[in-house]
């Protein structure tokens, strides 16, 4: 068994692990400006590996909402618990999973709204900034997300059942060995999609996909937030050292953003 949850105030270098038939790499870093200010990151990455099953969630808090990190952490924690609760049989039915996930997300609004409503603002805030934040509070905290589950169904062939769901501008790239075969359709046009603590899903429905419906075999996936756009153009699987260097280089960019990265192979 292996679990990971982001510490939104600490960087996690690219780390490699082999566990439960899976080989995976992961890393987390706040934007350069956020690190300098010793502030909280907006991304939240969480995953769990056990009994030949890998469940993961990556949430990217919307910075223009009320403390996007709140929605990111809350939603990631809840989605991971949901993915872990689903049976192997249920997860094979993409349509059933999509309907269940949609209902689950709607059911989180009341609890999430209470968390936002009772969140205490820092005392040192200026009256103007406090007014701005109170206005944002009324509209809720928001986050984009991608989540999924991989279940190994045959040890010999390493065949797996995969379910993916996404809302927002998140990256999911699928590989068959060292060859990239597909990119899960969550692109720039989806940047207005997100989940809100006040309104639930916004600007469109969840996009889902499954291994049975992809029409293309794959045994590896990259999942990462838009802060790691530097690897979008890479057409081969980068070594860990290069990933770490690209992550470090991004901190000095004027457009530096939080980075979450997960590479799962089976």
PLM segments and residue spans:
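N-terminal entry segment of metal-dependent catalytic domains or homologous docking segments
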Residues: 1-84, 170, 203-206, 210-211, ...
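Short helix/loop capping segments that flank catalytic or ligand/cofactor-binding pockets
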Residues: 66-68, 174-175, 232-233
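Short hydrophobic beta-strand that contains or immediately precedes a catalytic carboxylate
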Residues: 56-60, 165, 222-224
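Short glycine- and acidic-rich boundary segments immediately preceding or forming the N-terminal edge
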Residues: 1-44, 111-139, 157, 182-188
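Acidic loop->beta-strand submotif enriched in PP2C/PPM serine/threonine phosphatases
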Residues: 39-49, 137-163, 185-233
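C-terminal catalytic subdomain
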Residues: 1-2, 7, 126-132, 194-266
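Catalytic core of PPM/PP2C metal-dependent serine/threonine phosphatase domains
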Residues: 93-176, 204-215
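Helix-loop-helix
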Residues: 78-120, 233-257
């Amino acid at each position: 068994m292996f679990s990971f949850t982001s510490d939104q105030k600490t960087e996690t270098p690219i780390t490699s692990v082999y566990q439960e038939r899976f080989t995976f790499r992961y890393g987390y870093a706040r934007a350069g400006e956020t690190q300098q200010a010793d502030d909280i990151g907006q991304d939240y990455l969480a995953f769990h590996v056990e009994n030949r099953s890998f469940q993961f969630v990556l949430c990217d808090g919307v910075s223009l909402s009320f403390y996007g990190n709140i929605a990111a952490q809350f939603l990631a924690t809840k989605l991971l618990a949901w993915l872990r609760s689903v049976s192997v049989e249920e997860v094979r039915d993409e349509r059933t999973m999509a309907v269940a996930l949609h209902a689950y997300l709607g059911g989180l609004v009341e609890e999430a709204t209470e968390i936002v409503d009772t969140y205490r603002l820092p005392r040192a805030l200026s009256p103007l900034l406090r007014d701005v934040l109170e206005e944002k509070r009324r509209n809720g905290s928001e986050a984009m997300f991608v989540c999924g589950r991989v279940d190994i169904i045959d040890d010999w062939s390493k065949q797996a059942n995969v379910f993916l769901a996404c809302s927002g501008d998140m990256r999911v790239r699928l590989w068959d060995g060292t060859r990239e075969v597909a990119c899960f359709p969550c692109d720039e046009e989806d940047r207005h999609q997100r989940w809100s603590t006040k309104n639930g899903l916004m600007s469109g429905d969840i996009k889902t996909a499954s291994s049975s419906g992809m029409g293309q075999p794959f045994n590896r996936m990259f999942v990462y937030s838009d802060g790691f756009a530097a690897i979008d153009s890479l057409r081969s699987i980068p070594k860990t050292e290069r990933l770490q260097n690209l992550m470090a280089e991004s901190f000095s960019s004027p457009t530096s953003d939080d980075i979450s990265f997960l590479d799962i192979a089976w």
